[in-house]
Amino acid sequence: MGNLLNSIHSPADIKHFSVPQLEALAQEIRDRLIQSVARTGGHIGPNLGVVELTIAMHYVFDTPQDRFVFDVSHQAYVHKLLTGRANRFDTLRQPGGLNGFMLRSESQHDSYGAGHAGTALSAALGMAVARDIAGGHEHVVALAGDAAFTNGISFEALNNIADQTRRLIVVLNDNEWSIDRNVGAIARYLHKIVTNEHVSQFHDSAARLLKRIGGPAAANMVRRAEEAAKGMLWPSVLFEEFGLTYYGPIDGHNLSLLIDTFKFLKQQDRPVLLHAITQKGRGFEPALAGQKKFHGLGPFDPETGETSSSGQPTYSEVFARSLVKLADQNDKVVAITAAMPNGTGLDHFRPHHPARYFDVGIAEEHAVIFAAGMATRGFKPYCAIYSTFLQRAFDPIVHDVCLQNLPVVFCMDRGGLSGDDGPTHHGLFDISYLRGIPNIVHMVPADEDELADMMYTAMLHDGPSAIRYPRGTGPGHAVKQQPEALPIGKAKVLHEGEDIAILGLGALLPMAEQIREELARQGYRAAVINPRFVKPVDTELLAHYADRVTAFLTLEDHVLMGGFGSAVMEELNALGKSTPVVRIGWPDRFIEHGKVDQLRARYGISVEAAMEKLAPYLTRSAPLSVR
């Protein structure tokens, strides 16, 4: 049949394809996904699982007039290939290339941007209601994985759909996985439906009947039979109780069946939910064998699936090993994750202390309140959540943890720039959104050993704590056998100096050392300080240097607005000191995806940029101001 994928410039190009051609296209897409993502890295497993589903959606519906909303949208690679971006697909997640998620500014076919779970149903309902008010006729289709239904936002939307619109299609992509295996009652409920042999036999028969008869008569007959069967096979279908007519489960890899089903659903004048069973990693044996690993990963060998490793432990691994040691010593230590045991490292904790390990699903708000409840009973919860995902639980952090001064520890992985995953996954706001909350202590380690010390310090602290640490590996410092408790709010002076005081926060402490060396070459002596604490800031240290240096330089892997540099300025102002503060950090904008080093250079987070900003202060007679 030739190279079908290269002939597709818009979804309209597949509408004349036969089913055998579409099946051949599906194989081409899988081959392209494997070969391309092997070079760029990305979410290979989820996308291999939705190839037929996405092809069928584009075959039946007409984007951009019809609207597709992908929950999380990490599974939108096939959609990108079918909507005119195949010739740029090799740039996926690369600097200046395609984003790894849906992005409204990237294509008119991307109706809604995403990167976090649970948003698709609410957004799709908003589009459907807007269409109804405007008198439009376009279709709105929300594609959400079964993991998204462990998120409370999805149920808030379900609670409103039937009351607010008559036409909305929800596609439940059920592969039984988020990143790890799905957990909780919803996962068990869906599994029960899928494994009900009588239900499966009924739907196979219904599909054959629909295909054989066709037309409205068949649709009505099948619907009446389904309703009768549902009453016999299970007394109360969850989605029907929310007012959505349920269809399924059906084979999410059967193109002919999917196309017929979508054509049928397209004619319905009521909210419907299609339950499609898919296989994560389908068509690539390494991804099938390692579904957790191949959810999302860096470059890999397209033949074997093998990935390279530096051998040096990541911050996530150091965190997990340290937590195991703390739990060995203290039977009140518990670990909580929101569907991220692999990403946070807690899959290492689980076998050591299974009774004190809790995966609550994609439910960050619940995770925080659950932790608060445990803390009231004398336990020490370590709540491991990516920085970007913890912002979803801001109110529980304030209302349930900090207001009650409960000893919950927030372990914020991916604090700082995350790189290839882009703005939905950068952890650039946590200092701003946490440091204004009373009672919380906020720590930032500069190396692996300091992370272990901070986790120990948090265990001893009788109040809320937060620890932010970056993605990937650190400088390679060995972790002590027994961690040390750090004095709360005290920085560590690494080098004394009387010209400039450099405060290098966390991962940017090595840059502080480089700036010190450059200043020394120019004849200036700079103090280098490891702040360690964002809150409380070491006021005594600031007062000491404010009377000695011509300027402070703060370095942070965080937005400048409300960040660590702002905290330093506020403390100096409270002390009545007018010493200038030069701040290096991220600007007031959403930072695109790309390589961390390249993005830092582009946005002036570099030795060169710091030296340029410091130039006016490299003399004792420089005017006092804040830059």
Curated annotation (Swiss-Prot):
Any Pfam family matching the protein: DXP_synthase_N
GO cellular component: cytosol
GO biological process, one term: isopentenyl diphosphate biosynthetic process, methylerythritol 4-phosphate pathway
Binding site for Mg(2+): 146, 175
Catalytic activity: D-glyceraldehyde 3-phosphate + pyruvate + H(+) = 1-deoxy-D-xylulose 5-phosphate + CO2
EC number, UniProt record: 2.2.1.7
Top-level EC class as recorded in UniProt: transferase
Keyword vocabulary terms for this entry: Isoprene biosynthesis, Magnesium, Metal-binding, Thiamine biosynthesis, Thiamine pyrophosphate, Transferase
Protein's pathway: Metabolic intermediate biosynthesis; 1-deoxy-D-xylulose 5-phosphate biosynthesis; 1-deoxy-D-xylulose 5-phosphate from D-glyceraldehyde 3-phosphate and pyruvate: step 1/1
NCBIfam families per the UniProt record, alphabetical: dxs, PRK05444.2-2
Family: Belongs to the transketolase family. DXPS subfamily.
Name of protein: 1-deoxy-D-xylulose-5-phosphate synthase
